[in-house]
């Protein structure tokens, strides 16, 4: 009987995984476009995806340079609860950053008016700090304070979690954002205030059985996407997972062997670095090879600054193949051409980031929708397999 009990406990310990459903909504770009505000927004805000990954040096006032314009195209969001009783927030689960922040009742900016606001006085488990935080973007900063509370994520009660409470959010555009805040899932080394990231705090408390999480992004317009904390669900992918070592432990950065089209190398001829980022919708790379790719697929810029493609051309376009750790990962045109409301746009975006390793690419949702992705902190590796 004791052996049966022990086996039962072992089985339970191997099953401590939690799934957080993600909902696909209209992006901030789409909301601004529908309100006739996109062109004006793009004129006033210089979009620079690179600034998310290589910010300016952090100052003693805990300034985190992560431009929120970089979430312009993000479409996948999940719900978390903060406090006791829980106050719910819609957040971006972002493997390209490490901090958690949400709007608070102390924020009177227009951007906060139509979002859920955290009220510390309504939580019996909230613990204040004297630390402040500032996230700089565009023409101003989101400023706020840091506090501790219980964060509920997919059934997990993550106690004593540090997070940011916004007090000011400049600019009108965040008013139209389909999310309240950001939940970062990258390494603690890039946490702006030295704050322990959510997943690290979860693992430190052994609230999950494995030091990893995985992501499935559905192409479905609304449901089916999920973040899995503490495990892997093989029903979301076909074949076996191929493992890729993390090359730099900060972002989820890996090495790419080459990028080809029709058997011809079009980029990354001598290898390059890439960041796997759920918080970036598009697939970005250096401006020169991206410009060549845009030309090859027949993309041209419209008045809103979008790279549009003829929808009728999709069936004749070739796959673009990323070879990673010796394994080929093809992206069909149905993946890298984004179709919405009868129009088609390119899923590629130019971005120049000088690094010691050379050119840098960002494998955003365009890539992750095709490949179930495991972020393995225990072994510092990323697992990839074709989605089921």
From Swiss-Prot:
Q: Which GO terms describe its biological process?
A: digestion; proteolysis
Superkingdom of the organism of origin: Eukaryota
Report the SS bond pairs: 107-112, 268-272, 311-344
Modification(s) after translation: Each pepsinogen is converted to corresponding pepsin at pH 2.0 in part as a result of the release of a 47 AA activation segment and in part as a result of stepwise proteolytic cleavage via an intermediate form(s).
Q: Which reaction does it catalyse?
A: Preferential cleavage: hydrophobic, preferably aromatic, residues in P1 and P1' positions. Cleaves 1-Phe-|-Val-2, 4-Gln-|-His-5, 13-Glu-|-Ala-14, 14-Ala-|-Leu-15, 15-Leu-|-Tyr-16, 16-Tyr-|-Leu-17, 23-Gly-|-Phe-24, 24-Phe-|-Phe-25 and 25-Phe-|-Tyr-26 bonds in the B chain of insulin
- State the active site: 94, 277
> Which Gene Ontology molecular-function terms are recorded?
aspartic-type endopeptidase activity
Check the record and name the Pfam families matching this protein: A1_Propeptide (PF07966), Asp (PF00026)
Q: Which residues form the propeptide?
A: 16-38, 39-62
Query: SUPFAM superfamilies in the record, alphabetically?
Result: Acid proteases (SSF50630)
Where does the UniProt annotation locate this protein? Answer: Secreted
Phosphoserine: modified positions: 130
**Other facts noted in the record for this chain:** The expression of pepsinogen genes is regulated by hormones and related substances.
> Function, please?
Shows particularly broad specificity; although bonds involving phenylalanine and leucine are preferred, many others are also cleaved to some extent.
Member of which family? Belongs to the peptidase A1 family.
The protein here is known as Pepsin A-4
According to its UniProt entry, this protein's organism is Macaca fuscata fuscata (Japanese macaque)
Origin organism lineage: Eukaryota, Metazoa, Chordata, Craniata, Vertebrata
Q: Which gene encodes it?
A: PGA
